Amino acid sequence: MADNPASSSSQQLLALRVMRLARPKFAPVDGFSHDPVDPTGFGELLAGKVSEISKESRQDLPIGEYLIAPQMFENIYLGETFTFYVNVVNESEKTVSSVSLKCELQTSTQRVVLPCSVQDATIESSKCEGQVISHEVKEIGQHILICSVNYKTSNGENMYFRKFFKFPVSKPIDVKTKFYSAEDNANQDVYLEAQIENTSNANMFLEKVELDPSQHYNVTSIAHEDEFGDVGKLLKPKDIRQFLFCLTPADVHNTLGYKDLTSIGKLDMSWRTSMGEKGRLQTSALQRIAPGYGDVRLSVEKTPACVDVQKPFEVSCRLYNCSERALDLQLRLEQPSNRHLVFCSPSGVSLGQLPPSQHVDFSLNVFPVTVGIQSISGIRITDTFTKRIYEHDDIAQIFVS
């Protein structure tokens, strides 16, 4: 961290030191390969000398038996805990009193006061007062740690100085989301696909990836059982892992009221790096684009997947009134020009008056003429009051054999 001192006097009796606390790393092993069946034994002898010099008993492992302290100021990532040790040292030959230390962390949007217990302390010559402070980083970008010290000299003079320590905070993961609305599902289910990419320069192990839904939805995680178990949760730098969630309406009796809801919930993630450092992130509220159903919505409730050619089959449909007024609806069937499927049901049938947020069921008899995968099209719903026609094509596909 780069420091920038600022003081009210050039001659200070106290000195301020700040040190970031980070976990050590495993020391790498400079392995020496040799032929274990060398009849001369020279390779084994040379490998033994290398082990004697390096103090490592095993040369066949990628990491050693010893830990090393960080050799440089490593990156700080969003969601991690920033821990540092702040120490006030009396470098003079006099005792100072009323020593108070204040630590603040300033970002581009706010200034946070960090808890510090060094208050009204008395520090004798060559003595010190310090404290370990931890803070969860919640913003990316430039951060400034501001440490201010107030104290009194033996002559009763009030002294003050402060130091600034600047460091950047990067984003450890990148989250991309996609929403899929099951418009043919009467339950108004919504599927969320989340792609998580490790944008840091270190390996991470995903401990938890959960969706915290809004009050309007219940969530189910659609997780694939990885044949490698927890190995699938290990993300190397630039690795991407996908997660899928299904959200169903909490109020199953009023599913049509969910068509305009856009707030889905928040994605909650936690992970650990190679030495066990923990990180946690929660996204902002996820928003989806509400599907445009119009005033009416048609769904296929029941239909066979395969049928025999020239053998009629039945398709069960359900029509929803998504508007805020009652609709007087009429069903009309248009025979397709290709004549692969032919409607056998009467056209121009009245479906009656449909109140808001209600539905009506009806069935269609269809005669398959041509083999292959055929689409059901040509269903027309007419609002007899406004004379508006709602066209429904390709509502289902049938395999004709």
UniProtKB/Swiss-Prot annotation:
Coiled coil: none
Listed Pfam families: TRAPPC13_C (PF23643), TRAPPC13_M (PF23647), TRAPPC13_N (PF06159)
Signal peptide (UniProt feature, chain positions): none
GO CC terms, sorted: TRAPPIII protein complex
Protein family: Belongs to the TRAPPC13 family.
Name recorded for this polypeptide: Probable trafficking protein particle complex subunit 13 homolog
